[in-house]
């Protein structure tokens, strides 16, 4: 008996010894960055760093000239670092430290110094420039503008006596107005009565020629410029000690006129002139920045949109048809919108008019509209292309969109896309008496949402959150669960009792074609669906959010080298149940596979998908003038932003990337649907 216990003891000791020799391997912390070191020039710009890590990460490093957008995140998230113009006179360097557990990665950013200021001899009273006409129409009035200037000789202090706004009307090139605030500053004239402006003139501060680029001239008849509209935009840097002139074609009379400084340059203007004659004028001919419509948003008290939840009141003016058509509205609400896109420097917005409008010939008459920024989409057309594919595939509703130039509070913000708001309404989603939902990875941040029995997050978009009843919430939740359960049932392919009883197959497959042909990594990260009151089925659509499509995501590049569909490879999904649902329908239901081929062939042959690159060329021509201005405002053609896998430095090269992708995708997707 003693021997037996002794043997048991030896066995136990042997087991513990073996365990000690073979410990469980702990998870190794890891973190890496898309870039470790960057050297940039002295100009204002934004850098984007993508973090890959084994878990959550934190970021440290604080600089007043290089500000990071977030302090923590997860693997795959991007950090934006906004860098101000370097006017310090010397090179400067910032080091940011990323930590994931015990793993550390650093990012080093070096900004070169700006050009040295030329030493200028003191200039006597400036004689009239021979190119500066002695025009009796040169206007005078009360000088108005930003209250405070900056005194560079006294530690950049706030001043009302040094470098003031009066200097721009003193006839001298060696004096200038430099505002204390870096942005949202201006200078102009109160003319005392309405004038038709025929010409404007300007000259940059000596040595600061580039600071006039994208300055905006505006006219108004309210002293707070709440009714201001543009009359000219400066497209190029200036020349030292030179007046630059522009003839103005705007038939409206203005009492107040002003020069609005570009962002982050403190005006830095030497001379300013306005020409014209008294007159009420009319709105028969207004000014557009480019061939695209110009959208002007003047927010009450000049407030800036800084959040998505707070609505600000504004006056909105949409100038189109070469300046001969004007939509003017008051009491329009504006706020931020978007998820990841809201963190970009170029912000997206939502407008809500006080009355229903149909801007730019839109099919819907509605209050709610969106302004998409397309920040990471350098051809500025990927959403427009996705909508075109949607139309050619034959989805029931495709959102209206039109590219526009956007001005907010007198500042040019870039080329945007005016779009429908996705909602259940006449001319939009045909579900006014039914339901509109969104399979949505961000549903948890919404007010009205549910998680399905299989863990799929779903936001209820209609009925609205302030109108929906508990009974309605329960009904659509239960119905979605029934649909999902039917897809995963053993008899799910049964034509009468299977999933097609709850889910419209054609719209599901058409949405699939748009997402997979278009190369959208996030097709099933966000999916709109609506329940038609007539037949009771869930329909899929509309398509939305295609910034990352058409080869614009490093996570799936190169798409046409993937062996399988994107959703089954590296695509983002709101839940694994969604991925499995798509597989069961598209790959494992013989009738659905056959129907997918039919819809694809129809879209190619009758819908004209094979000619989609002609649409790319048309869009590029339409956007030619606007994109030039946009990338002067947002200098990112040489930068990786958001999920970009490349930075080509050229708009034309970015467009060619899209065309090359489409050519290859036509062949690859045809192979996939027939596999």
Language-model features, listed with the residues they occupy:
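Disordered, acidic Ser/Thr/Pro-rich linker "stalks" and the adjacent N-terminal cap
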Residues: 120-192, 205-211, 278-281
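Trp- and acidic/polar-enriched beta-sheet ligand-binding modules for extracellular glycan
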Residues: 146, 153, 181-184, 208-279
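Surface-exposed binding patches on compact interaction domains or structured appendages
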Residues: 30-33, 52-80
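A short beta-strand element within beta-rich, extracytoplasmic domains
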Residues: 195-207, 259
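Internal "kinase-insert"/substrate-recognition segments embedded within catalytic cores
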Residues: 297, 352, 357-358, 373, ...
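Bacterial Sec-dependent N-terminal signal peptides
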Residues: 16-39, 100, 106, 110-137
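Middle-to-C-terminal accessory/interaction subdomains
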Residues: 303-305, 329-331, 338-340, 344, ...
């Amino acid at each position: 008996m003693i021997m037996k216990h002794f043997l048991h003891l030896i066995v136990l000791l042997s087991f513990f010894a073996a365990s000690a020799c073979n410990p469980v391997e702990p998870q190794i912390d890891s973190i890496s960055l898309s870039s470790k070191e960057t050297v940039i020039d002295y100009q204002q710009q934004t850098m984007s760093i993508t973090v890959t890590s084994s878990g959550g990460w934190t970021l440290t490093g604080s600089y007043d000239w290089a500000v990071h957008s977030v302090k923590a995140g997860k693997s795959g998230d991007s950090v934006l670092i906004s860098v101000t113009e370097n006017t310090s006179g010397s090179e400067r360097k910032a080091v940011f430290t990323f930590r994931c557990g015990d793993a550390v990665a650093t990012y080093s950013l070096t900004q070169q110094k700006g050009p040295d200021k030329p030493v200028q001899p003191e200039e006597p009273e400036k004689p009239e420039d021979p190119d500066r006409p002695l025009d009796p129409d040169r206007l005078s009035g009360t000088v108005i503008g930003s209250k405070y200037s900056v005194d560079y000789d006294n530690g950049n202090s706030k001043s009302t006596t040094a470098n003031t706004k009066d200097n721009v009307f003193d006839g001298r090139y060696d004096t200038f107005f430099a505002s204390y605030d870096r942005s949202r500053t201006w200078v102009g004239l109160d003319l005392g009565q309405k004038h038709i402006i025929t010409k404007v003139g300007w000259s940059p501060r000596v040595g600061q020629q580039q600071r006039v680029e994208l300055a905006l001239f505006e006219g108004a008849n309210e002293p707070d410029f709440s009714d201001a509209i543009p009359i000219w935009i400066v497209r190029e840097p200036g020349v030292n000690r030179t007046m630059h002139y522009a003839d103005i074609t705007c038939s409206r009379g203005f009492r107040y006129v002003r020069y609005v400084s570009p962002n982050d340059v403190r005006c830095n203007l030497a001379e300013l002139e306005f020409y014209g004659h008294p007159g009420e004028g009319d709105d028969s001919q207004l000014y557009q920045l480019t061939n695209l419509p110009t959208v002007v948003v003047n927010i009450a008290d000049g407030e800036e949109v800084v959040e998505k939840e707070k609505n600000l009141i504004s006056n909105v003016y949409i100038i189109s048809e070469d300046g001969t058509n004007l939509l003017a509205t008051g009491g329009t609400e504006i706020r931020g919108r978007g998820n990841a896109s809201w963190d970009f420097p170029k912000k997206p917005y939502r407008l809500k008019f006080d009355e229903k409008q149909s801007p730019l010939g839109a099919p819907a008459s509605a209050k709610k509209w969106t302004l998409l920024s397309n920040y990471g989409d350098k051809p500025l057309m990927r959403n427009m292309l996705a909508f075109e594919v949607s139309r050619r595939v034959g989805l029931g509703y495709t959102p209206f969109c039109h590219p526009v130039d956007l001005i907010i509070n007198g500042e040019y913000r870039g080329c945007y896309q005016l779009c429908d708001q996705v909602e259940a309404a006449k001319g939009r989603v045909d579900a006014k008496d039914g339901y509109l939902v969104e399979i949505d990875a961000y549903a948890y941040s919404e007010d009205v949402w549910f998680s399905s029995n299989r863990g799929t997050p779903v936001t209820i978009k209609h009925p609205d959150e302030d109108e929906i009843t508990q009974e309605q919430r329960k009904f659509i939740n239960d119905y979605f669960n029934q649909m999902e359960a039917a897809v995963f049932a053993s008899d799910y392919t049964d034509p009468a009792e299977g999933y097609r009883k709850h889910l419209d197959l054609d719209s599901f497959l058409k949405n699939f074609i748009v997402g997979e042909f278009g190369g959208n990594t996030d097709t099933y990260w966000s999916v709109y669906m609506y329940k038609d009151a007539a037949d009771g089925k869930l329909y899929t659509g509309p398509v939305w959010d295609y910034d990352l499509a058409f080869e614009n995501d490093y996570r799936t590049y190169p798409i046409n080298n993937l062996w399988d569909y994107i959703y089954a490879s590296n695509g983002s999904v709101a839940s694994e149940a969604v991925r499995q649902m798509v597989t069961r329908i598209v790959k494992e239901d013989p009738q659905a596979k056959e129907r997918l081929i039919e819809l694809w062939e129809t879209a190619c042959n009758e819908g004209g998908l094979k000619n989609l690159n002609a649409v790319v060329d048309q869009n590029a021509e339409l956007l030619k003038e606007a994109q030039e201005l946009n990338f002067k405002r947002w200098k990112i053609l040489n930068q990786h932003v958001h999920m970009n896998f490349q930075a080509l430095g050229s708009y034309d090269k970015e467009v060619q990337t899209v065309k090359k992708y489409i050519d290859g995708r036509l062949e690859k997707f045809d192979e996939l649907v027939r596999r």
